Amino acid sequence: MSAPATRDMRTSAPGVFMAVLWRDIFVTGRELPVFLAQVILQPLFMLFVFGKVLSNLGYTRPGYAHLLFPGIVALTALLTSLQSTALPLVLEFSFTKEIEDRLLAPIPTALVAVEKMIFAAMRALIAAVCMFPIGILILGSVPWRAAGAPEFVVILILGVLAGSAMGLTMGTLVPPNRISIAFSLVLTPLLFTGCSQYPWPTLDSLRWFQIVTLFNPLTYVSEGMRGALVPYVPHMRAWVCVAALVFWLAAFSAIGIWGFIRRAID
């Protein structure tokens, strides 16, 4: 290939990348009510039952709803990005074959995988932000600190990207006929060992379980958001959460992109 042709391809790659991303955003915009119903229903009921019903019945301590809310936002962000990457990839690689159109685009295969991650992360950002008006509607108020906004934004972005990287890994490495089993084996432990319902430092009396939670990326999203929104509650240090999320993001991205390229070649 000549030098000018190579330069043209490099110049056009960002434009093609943005065009593919915009196409996905446009499709989601047309189906926004359905998308929101899919991703918000579960955290909405968790917030309602654990934050409102149990509180009104006296089964939780006063203020538990404000402790719970950052964890529910974290759960919504990470699970939405994970599912928004994994499930479409399984369908596109095995049934609809829609991924073949993307692979024909004049951009590196790795960038197609990155586009999938970024698009899923954007969907997760929308879902996480929507939890604030829902929280106000259900709880009457939600914790928010202007001083904690930068930390919250950093943790949120790292959390949705880590979740989409996890989804990329699952969607490319798990066989299509095993994806439902994989989700059953992954999502339930992810949900209950991610410190979304309880602060990590309070698990001192259950040391073995406290150690187990460290292997769940959701733990660091929950703790980081808790530190940003309700700093008076025991929580991990912000730098620990950021460092851990960067590690999980890098690890799952490397594995997921490798798996994506392998599936694309096959």
What feature does the model see in each segment?
Residues 45-50, 65-138, 185-186, 191:
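Hydrophobic alpha-helical transmembrane segments of multi-pass membrane transport proteins
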Residues 7, 31-35, 67-71, 79-83, ...:
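Short alpha-helical transmembrane interface motifs in multi-pass membrane proteins
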Residues 29, 33, 52-62:
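Short, hydrophobic transmembrane alpha-helix segments
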Residues 109, 113-185, 235-257:
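Alpha-helical transmembrane segments and their short interhelical loops
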Residues 2-42:
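Aromatic- and glycine-rich beta-strand/loop motifs that create alpha-glucan
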Residues 142-143, 195-251:
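Membrane-interfacial helix-loop-helix junctions in multi-pass membrane proteins
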Residues 54, 171-215:
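Transmembrane helix segments
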Residues 2-7, 229-233, 243-266:
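Junction motif at the cytosolic side of a transmembrane helix
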